[in-house]
């Protein structure tokens, strides 16, 4: 899973589900239990940080409290990083206020006058993990996971998280978690020493009992600097990490070197000085343009799931529906195993017995290859196979909610589908959508993006089911209207390159700039015509579908970084070469007149 992969359902606490005060407290047998009930999956924003600071202060001052336990409502202890950076723009960057507040809170937790235990469940991410590492002890549900996504987003972990991780585990294990592309289980050998495991059903009682035990026996409080005991091994891990880095890092990777400097400071400096050193680097990384670009794309990934159809229907009704699929053997081998692994019941259908047998055999061969390569166990393969069936005709008694067909199967399958069964067209590379709802993956061997091409009056539930299907295929779904945005954006960039190569003269601006301008201008047209919903969708389209560098944020974000007045001026210069490609779109003129940016349309 990449930094921009479709996020799994976080079950965030929103609206009435989030407590007004964000932190609830009850005291039982001398243990104060503080429960985070913050918005958006308990992400550590300024309000939640302030509420926690008040809650801890009150518990520490209460003579009837001997120990403190911190837990959380909802499916996650902390679902992710708080969105604290503004969109890319030419405005001078500001240090987010929450950085200092979280660091101060973690310092107070680390100096708690009473034993403080964190009871962890679900995802323990970013600021939530920094809080946990500052506590005296952690008690985790065996299904809990931990992650600092910041190193993959141009930043450093907040709240002294990298330091405390190294202090507890040593440099090698700390780097395993810091460099992990996805959350690690608390049972992972690298981080298992952090946690006392407890069954989920008994997590809170176990944490309360452990906190009370530590109050009675403070000598049992885990050593906060155990990871520094083997100094040669610590230094060796840092040497290996530095040896694996380029001698000269580009600007968007400077935070990687800073992270190693912080881990080195964890060993060489007194704790207070190391924390101050870390804080400077955390703030510096947050000010970088690449950090803002990564943050923009993270928001774009979540925002892309909000569509007119998602507002009109309940996503829950789009889940867990059996799928009828009429696919070529190659396409079935590509798509069906992942759907089966995700629990989808799939019925493959074909008019020809031989063709159906060939398609089923293609899926079986892919399963065998996955078992042989270690990507799946034999038991899992056999379990998945129970969810697959084949038919030569429709079963009127068991009509699926959704049918998926490749182009060759559209006509005959559509003619036989009963009323109420929606068909989605899987558009192969270069094809055109032929249904009310079509799925068009990005043209790549392993696509990360799938456009949901929606025609006029397409049923909202069908769009949602198609979006859910794309996510189950581990593709980021992007809703577009009537035609592919990616195809037009790629065509604009290619056309700009061709114009420059065949012109026989020096372009008015550097070639790369000319291609960027053409892409931005095409994106503006797609927004004006209603093909794309928002500028961030276009950025996500180019990053996931065309290899646009993530650290640049996407073409529309770059347009905002340039500034629309400068953008219009440069487009007018470029239009002398090709007016159709570079004449500023009217949307750009409208935004300038209103004093807006592309980001204001997100």
Model-derived features with residue positions:
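Intrinsically disordered, low-complexity segments enriched in small/flexible residues
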Residues: 2-18, 35, 49, 69-71, ...
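Internal alpha-helical scaffold of NAD(P)-dependent oxidoreductase catalytic cores
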Residues: 184, 342-344, 450-482, 490-506, ...
């Amino acid at each position: 899973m990449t930094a921009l992969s479709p996020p799994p359902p976080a079950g965030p606490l929103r609206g009435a589900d989030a407590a007004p005060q964000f932190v609830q407290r009850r005291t039982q047998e001398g243990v104060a239990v503080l429960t985070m009930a913050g918005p958006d999956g308990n992400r550590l924003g300024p309000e939640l940080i302030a509420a926690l600071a008040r809650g801890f202060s009150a518990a520490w001052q209460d003579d009837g409290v001997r120990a403190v336990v911190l837990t959380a409502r909802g499916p996650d202890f902390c679902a992710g990083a708080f969105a604290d950076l503004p969109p890319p723009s030419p405005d001078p960057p500001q240090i987010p206020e929450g950085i200092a507040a979280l660091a101060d809170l973690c310092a107070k937790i680390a100096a708690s006058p009473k034993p403080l235990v964190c009871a962890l469940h679900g995802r323990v991410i970013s600021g939530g993990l920094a809080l946990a590492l500052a506590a005296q002890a952690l008690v985790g549900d065996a299904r809990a996971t931990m992650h600092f996504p910041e190193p993959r987003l141009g930043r450093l972990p907040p709240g002294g998280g990298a330091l405390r991780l190294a202090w507890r585990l040593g440099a090698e294990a700390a780097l395993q978690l810091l460099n992990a592309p996805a959350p690690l289980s608390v049972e992972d050998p690298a981080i298992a020493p952090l946690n006392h495991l407890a069954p989920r059903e008994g997590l809170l009682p176990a944490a309360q009992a452990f906190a009370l035990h530590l109050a009675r026996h403070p000598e049992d409080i885990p050593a906060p600097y155990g990871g520094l005991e083997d100094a040669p091994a610590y230094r060796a891990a840092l040497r290996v990490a530095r040896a694996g880095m380029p001698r000269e890092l580009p600007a968007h990777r400077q935070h990687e070197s800073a992270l190693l400097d912080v881990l080195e400071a964890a060993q060489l400096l007194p704790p207070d000085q190391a924390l101050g050193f870390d804080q400077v680097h955390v703030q510096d990384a947050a000010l970088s343009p690449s950090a803002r670009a990564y943050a923009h794309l993270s928001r774009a990934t979540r925002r892309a799931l909000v569509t007119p159809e998602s507002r009109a229907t309940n996503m829950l009704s789009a889940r867990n529906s059996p799928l009828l699929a009429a696919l070529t053997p190659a396409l079935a081998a590509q798509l069906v195993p992942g759907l089966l692994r995700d629990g989808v019941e799939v019925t493959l259908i074909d008019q020809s017995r031989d063709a159906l047998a060939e398609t089923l055999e293609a899926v079986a061969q892919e399963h065998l290859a996955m078992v042989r390569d270690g990507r799946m166990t034999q038991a899992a393969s056999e379990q998945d196979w129970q969810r697959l069936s084949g038919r030569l005709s429709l079963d009127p008694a068991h009509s699926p909610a959704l049918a998926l067909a490749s182009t060759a199967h559209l006509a005959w399958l559509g003619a036989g589908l009963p009323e109420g069964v929606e068909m989605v067209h899987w558009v192969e590379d270069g094809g055109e959508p032929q249904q009310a709802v079509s799925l068009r993956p990005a043209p790549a061997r392993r696509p990360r993006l799938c456009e949901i091409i929606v025609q006029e009056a397409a049923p909202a539930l069908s769009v949602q089911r198609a979006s859910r299907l794309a996510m189950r295929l581990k593709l980021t779904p992007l809703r577009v209207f009537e035609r592919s945005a990616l195809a037009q954006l790629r065509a604009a960039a290619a056309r700009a390159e061709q114009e420059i190569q065949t012109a026989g003269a020096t372009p008015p601006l550097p070639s790369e700039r000319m291609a960027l301008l053409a892409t931005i201008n095409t994106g503006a047209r797609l927004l004006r015509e209603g093909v794309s919903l928002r500028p961030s969708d276009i950025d996500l389209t180019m990053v996931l579908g065309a290899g646009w560098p993530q650290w640049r944020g996407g073409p529309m974000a770059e347009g905002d970084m340039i500034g629309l007045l400068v953008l219009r001026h440069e487009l007018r210069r470029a239009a002398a070469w090709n007016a159709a490609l570079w004449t500023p779109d009217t949307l750009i003129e409208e935004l300038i007149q209103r004093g807006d940016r592309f980001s204001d349309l997100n």
